[in-house]
């Protein structure tokens, strides 16, 4: 309920959720609610996955399940589309790999799934213009994979008007039983566990020695912004070991 309310009042939303945290169920239900309550003519919504087949396997069954009880609902299996006759609204599952098929459409709202695997060019050049004439919303959902575009969106949303961001860690949501998390922690590398279940953007930097250290510093609020004093010389020297993770100078 909290997340639906936040996404109702903010146009652009970045939702970072641990694996098996229910983000797809949230996203599909939010689209259905938005579609059925839209007063505009012919509302259009899309759930966009990195690949169409991926969207079909992760979201299509949920879309059919949660909209099946709505009178007048029609399903198009070949186009992964649901049409609601009550107000001529539509929700479709789309793959980002076929970006040319998206161009030129309009949307009242979109969900971008697994945003960490989506190229920023897709939103900048295709999706964002599709939202303009209807002032549509966008919700970016996913799990961290290093400091890529998804991380940039998360940081941007902290300070931009009409943007919202939130992080749901497995240790906080309690969705996954504690004993299962303990078992996963034993089976996975510390970095992978932190990334997939604790939503760490640092852990995704494979082979890095500094990732866990910076993560700890950030959690302790020991990394701050300071005004630049141009009278003081500052030098930093780094060898990040991108090709050889055993070398530090």
Which positions does each model-derived feature cover?
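Phosphate/NTP-binding elements of NTP-utilizing enzymes
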Residues: 1-246
């Amino acid at each position: 309920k909290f997340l639906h309310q936040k996404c109702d009042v903010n146009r652009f939303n970045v939702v970072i959720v641990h694996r098996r945290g229910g983000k797809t169920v949230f996203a599909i239900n939010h689209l259905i609610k938005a579609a059925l309550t839209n007063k505009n003519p012919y509302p259009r919504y899309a759930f966009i996955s990195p690949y169409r087949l991926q969207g079909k396997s992760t979201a299509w069954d949920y879309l059919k399940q949660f909209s099946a009880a709505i009178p007048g609902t029609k399903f198009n299996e070949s186009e992964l589309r649901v049409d609601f006759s009550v107000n001529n609204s539509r929700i479709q599952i789309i793959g980002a790999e076929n970006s040319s098929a998206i161009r030129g459409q309009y949307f009242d709202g979109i969900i971008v799934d697994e945003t960490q695997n989506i190229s920023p060019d897709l939103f900048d050049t295709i999706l964002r213009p599709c939202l303009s004439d209807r002032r549509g919303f966008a919700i970016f959902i996913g799990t961290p994979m290093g400091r890529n575009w998804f991380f940039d969106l998360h940081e941007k949303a902290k300070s931009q008007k009409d943007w919202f961001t939130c992080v749901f860690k497995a240790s906080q949501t309690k969705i996954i039983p504690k004993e299962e998390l303990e078992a996963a922690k034993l089976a996975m590398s510390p970095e992978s566990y932190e990334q997939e279940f604790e939503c760490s953007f640092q852990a995704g930097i494979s082979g890095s020695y500094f990732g866990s250290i910076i993560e700890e510093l950030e959690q302790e609020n020991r990394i701050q912004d300071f005004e630049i004093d141009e009278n003081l010389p500052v030098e930093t020297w780094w060898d990040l070991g991108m090709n050889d993770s055993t070398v530090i100078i």
